Amino acid sequence: MPPKFDPTEIKIVYLRCVGGEVGATSALAPKVGPLGLSPKKIGEDIAKATQDWKGLKVTCKLTIQNRVAKIDVVPSAASLIVKELKEPPRDRKKVKNVKHNGDLTVDTIIKIARIMRPRSMAKKLEGTVKEILGTAQSVGCTIDGQHPHDIIESIANGEIEIPAQ
């Protein structure tokens, strides 16, 4: 028999979900059911919390204490980039593996890098900016009309100055 569940204990559960949609409660049930929470209610709360990430895949962090769930959205670099492109949300069921062809500025990339900084493995902000540029390359967008890899090279050569913090 497993030990009795301690209500004051803080449990953290990470979930991948699509913003603004109530995910499959069948996926939530095994994660939150044993903690004494209703998967349906959690699903609705997640949909509410991820409203401004409509149609994008984001990671949600559920912090559960005393049978109350607090939901934080932990966006990936890719979803931050796609959100900054300000493209209209697409129908996920019809359009698959979409290539984004927007254009971002270096300042926007630095802004995204600052958001991602705590989770980055880089020593300096410059390294985090390069990580974000690599993701931008995968997403398929351009930076100031240039390919992201050209920007990475010009940062490495010192042509583009990245602030220390």
Swiss-Prot record:
Q: Which SMART domains match?
A: RL11
Question: What is any one of the record's Gene Ontology cellular component terms?
Answer: cytosolic large ribosomal subunit
| Family statement drawn from the similarity comment of this UniProt entry | Belongs to the universal ribosomal protein uL11 family.
Pfam families given for it?
Ribosomal_L11, Ribosomal_L11_N
Q: Which GO terms describe its biological process?
A: regulation of alternative mRNA splicing, via spliceosome; translation
- Its gene name is rpl-12
Q: Does the keyword Cell inner membrane apply?
A: no
Purpose: Binds directly to 26S ribosomal RNA.
State the PANTHER family in the record.
60S RIBOSOMAL PROTEIN L12, LARGE RIBOSOMAL SUBUNIT PROTEIN UL11
Q: Tell me what this protein is called.
A: Large ribosomal subunit protein uL11
Alphabetized Gene3D superfamilies for the sequence: Ribosomal protein L11, C-terminal domain, Ribosomal protein L11/L12, N-terminal domain
Query: Does Ribosomal protein count among this protein's keywords?
Result: yes
The organism's superkingdom is given as Eukaryota
Q: Which UniProt keywords apply?
A: Ribonucleoprotein, Ribosomal protein, RNA-binding
GO molecular function, one example? structural constituent of ribosome
The chain's coiled-coil residues are none
